């Protein structure tokens, strides 16, 4: 009989990252299937440590994955802290190093240096090439929430002020209620409800953005849905400048012309005052929203775009948006990932894992190029 798979859930280290790759619910199912699950203590995680203990997981110290036995598979969400020591375990995580992101070679080279392996969560795909688990829906939902909140803030505050920091909500209802209240305050001051243009409207992310817009009371005729059909002629697009809020939800798989540029932005006739780049391909040389250079944070959700005409323009480029709703986002993601995790004992033959390993090997070969 093969030895049980040992999963070690590491504590996330990114500030304000409350999500978790495993939840108490999915941990129980893994334990029932014969896995061993070690969970690092975490003051940040939306789930209490005790919730994992209650389902039978073994609690271990935060950061102990570094010296954990090599037969444990290390699972987490966001990239590891920037260190240089070689990585000797098998890791399951989002690593953001396969699309030529800034510093990708430094990130990726740590794995072959220690004879470790990376199974990148972004590239775990089923037989149809569809990702088995993604945070897209909640990323779009949270991004739209911050976008609408920013727009409402602009209507009720002077241009010299930016939207203050936001923090995680315990559940979706509280978030929706807060945005509704902000919108009502803007309308009370004489503003009409905003028009929202969503690019990537047919995907998970776009669906989440549209769902938020509806739930906070933005009328259907104010929600403009674009997908590949509408963008195939190539940008930049005047229609973006004519909307109040632009939400970019596309998955960037190849270079495309920019959706927006300064020629469109630097006009008195521009209506656009909020851009939410949910895709947040900030360091990607082909970012289709090339009007900002930094990833924003929950502490400072937006940065102003340097324009010479038209209303104030704020951009939100937070790269961990689903953390605004960490409990729902984690439950949905982990439940979607579970069938693949249950195949880990057969990872040498199960297609979802062999494809991910082949992709890792392919990109490792590129390091020396």
Curated annotation (Swiss-Prot):
GO BP terms: lysine biosynthetic process via aminoadipic acid
Binding site for NAD(+): 130, 203-204, 227, 231, 251, 278, 318-321
Keyword NAD: yes
Intrachain S-S bonds: 205-249
Annotated EC: 1.5.1.7
Enzyme class, spelled out: oxidoreductase
Residues that bind L-saccharopine: 19, 78, 101, 131, 135, 279-281
Keywords, alphabetical: Amino-acid biosynthesis, Disulfide bond, Lysine biosynthesis, NAD, Oxidoreductase
Superkingdom of origin organism: Eukaryota
Reaction equations catalysed: L-saccharopine + NAD(+) + H2O = L-lysine + 2-oxoglutarate + NADH + H(+)
Pfam families registered for this protein in UniProt: AlaDh_PNT_C, AlaDh_PNT_N
GO molecular function: saccharopine dehydrogenase (NAD+, L-lysine-forming) activity; saccharopine dehydrogenase activity
SMART domains linked: AlaDh_PNT_C, AlaDh_PNT_N
Keyword Protease attributed: no
Single GO cellular component term: cytoplasm
Pathway of action: Amino-acid biosynthesis; L-lysine biosynthesis via AAA pathway; L-lysine from L-alpha-aminoadipate (fungal route): step 3/3
Active site: 78 (proton acceptor), 96 (proton donor)
Function: Catalyzes the NAD(+)-dependent cleavage of saccharopine to L-lysine and 2-oxoglutarate, the final step in the alpha-aminoadipate (AAA) pathway for lysin biosynthesis.
Quaternary structure (record): Monomer.
Protein family: Belongs to the AlaDH/PNT family.
Name of this protein: Saccharopine dehydrogenase [NAD(+), L-lysine-forming]
UniProt organism field: Yarrowia lipolytica (strain CLIB 122 / E 150)
Gene (name only): LYS5
């Amino acid at each position: 009989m093969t030895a049980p798979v040992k999963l070690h859930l590491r504590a996330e280290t990114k500030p304000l990252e409350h999500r978790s790759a495993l939840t108490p619910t999915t941990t129980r199912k893994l334990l029932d299937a014969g896995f061993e699950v070690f969970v690092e203590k975490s003051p940040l995680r939306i789930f209490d440590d005790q919730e994992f203990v209650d389902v039978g997981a073994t609690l271990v110290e935060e950061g102990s994955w570094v010296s954990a036995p090599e037969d444990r598979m290390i699972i987490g969400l966001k990239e590891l802290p920037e260190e240089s020591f070689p990585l000797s375990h098998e890791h399951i995580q989002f690593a953001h190093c396969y699309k030529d992101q800034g510093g990708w070679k430094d990130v990726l080279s740590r794995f072959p240096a220690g004879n470790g392996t990376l199974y990148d969560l972004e590239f775990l795909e089923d037989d149809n090439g569809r990702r088995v688990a993604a945070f897209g829906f909640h990323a779009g939902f949270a991004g739209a929430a911050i976008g609408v909140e920013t727009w409402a803030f602009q209507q009720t505050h002077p241009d010299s002020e930016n939207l203050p920091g936001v923090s995680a909500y315990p559940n979706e209802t509280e978030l929706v209620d807060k945005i509704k209240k902000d919108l009502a305050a803007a309308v009370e001051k004489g503003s009409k409800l905003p028009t929202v243009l969503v690019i990537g409207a047919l995907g998970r992310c776009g669906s989440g953005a549209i769902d938020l817009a509806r739930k906070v009371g933005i009328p259907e005729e104010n929600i403009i849905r674009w997908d590949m059909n509408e963008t195939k002629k190539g940008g930049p697009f005047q229609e973006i400048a004519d909307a109040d809020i632009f939400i970019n939800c596309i998955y960037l798989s190849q270079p495309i012309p920019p959706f927006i540029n300064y020629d469109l932005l630097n006009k008195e006739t521009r209506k656009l005052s909020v851009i939410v780049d949910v895709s947040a391909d900030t360091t990607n040389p082909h970012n289709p929203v090339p009007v900002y250079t930094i990833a924003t944070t929950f502490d400072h959700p937006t940065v102003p775009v340097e324009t010479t005409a038209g209303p104030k323009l704020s951009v939100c480029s937070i790269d961990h948006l689903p953390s605004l709703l960490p409990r729902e986002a984690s439950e949905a993601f982990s439940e979607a990932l579970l069938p693949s995790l249950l195949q880990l004992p057969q990872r040498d033959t199960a297609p979802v894992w062999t494809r991910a390993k082949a992709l890792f090997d392919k990109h490792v070969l590129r390091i020396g190029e």
